[in-house]
Amino acid sequence: MRKTIAVLGSALFFVVAPLVLAGFVPWWITHWEFRPAFFGFELTRAIGLMLIIAGVPGVVDSFARFALQGLGTPAPIAPTQKLVVTGLYRYVRNPIYVGVPAVIFGQALLFGDWRLLWYAALLWLFFHIFVLVYEEPTLKQTFGAQYEDFRANVPRWVPRLTAWRVP
């Protein structure tokens, strides 16, 4: 039963958070209308599309791992019961907080819209402060040495080149 509740909670939080932050808000800002490519380089559009294609599945996978393995959600009001250290979490501690701004940044490049660049940067800054002030201290208190080992081996923002092997 716990897994079912976790899946439903994660699905609801996915709609409330990433779908709104990386879908609705960028659409509201740009109406997904193409503007001239940044600096006249059409290649930026392809790079943007690649960021979107890489970011969306990464965020979805991370949400699924929270529900199915962590038996909770990414939302602070319904946190995981277990520390999730598989999948993209073997490369970076915050794949959702990396993936959502990457999708927004990708849309900025794809649509050639500077406003989305600023939005992505401000959102990432908010995520960074939230991680430092709330999330990391809470995870340390909740999971203790297990989290400290994870934290010592997996970077916060820039992914490792090789997967961390959980001892």
Where is each model-derived feature located?
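Solvent-exposed interhelical
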Residues: Y89
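Extended, alpha-helix-rich binding/interface surfaces that flank or overlap catalytic cores
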Residues: N94
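Membrane-anchoring alpha-helices and their flanking helix-loop junctions
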Residues: M1-T86, V98-P167
